[in-house]
Amino acid sequence: MRLARDDAGKGAPVLLVHGFPTSRRLWLGLTPEFLRAGFRVVAPDLAGYGESPGAPDVGMESQAGWLLALLDELDLGRVTLIAHDVGTAAAQILAVRAPERVRELVLMDGVYETEWAMAAVESIRSWNPEDAARLQPVLARRLRPIRALLDAYVGEEGGKRLIHAARCLDPRQTEGMTATLRATGIPLRLIWGSDDAFLPVDTVAKPLAAALGAPLEIVPGGHFLPVENPAGVAAALLRRRPD
């Protein structure tokens, strides 16, 4: 599996992992800030998302394996791993599998154990593939902050890819993960949108931070923080520079 990716800069590596239903374009507003700060920035499209090829299983457990393969392909030793939404599931699995590859893990508006905000994607999971061409316009209306990121899912083929990706999401893949992740000793941080309606601060972010023993920073904005408030996210991320 060769993941489509953006790769720029020559400093310490930062790996940016998007979630559902976005793509590596989620990070376009943040990448220039990291480059100016002197980092190498690698932002892939997860398998089956954006411009990356699909597979029978594009769940987050499989994604973690492909992300590790990407680190090997690019000869990246240890990275600062920053992930959003269900991409944080892939990031947690990667960190537990190969803690020696992760310098720091930053979880942004992400999953906590089996809390993956599945109610928000349930309608997509049950969408009739025969009507797939109608899916992207519906999502563009519902998810206005990221409507420009949904271009990869235009038309029947794009809609079918998105339905398949939704059906591969399995919250059981991070059940019991929190204690294991904390035991790795990897430095952990959480950054969260103050108005996240999908994975709220009080019911997800704060319990996750407490369980991980990790600092939590609240940034003004909703669930799709890297798009809604890139300046605020960049400031939060770079306040403690990845070494």
Model-derived regions: residue spans:
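Alpha/beta-hydrolase fold catalytic core
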Residues: 1-14, 36-39, 72, 76-77, ...
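The conserved beta1-alpha1 loop
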Residues: 17-19, 84, 192
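Active-site loop/oxyanion-hole signature of alpha/beta-hydrolase fold enzymes
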Residues: 36, 43-82, 235
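Conserved alpha/beta-hydrolase catalytic His-Asp/Glu region
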Residues: 116, 133-186
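Conserved HGGG/HGGXW glycine-rich cap/lid loop of the alpha/beta-hydrolase fold
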Residues: 6-51
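Conserved loop-alpha-helix segment in the C-terminal half of the alpha/beta-hydrolase fold
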Residues: 184-221, 227
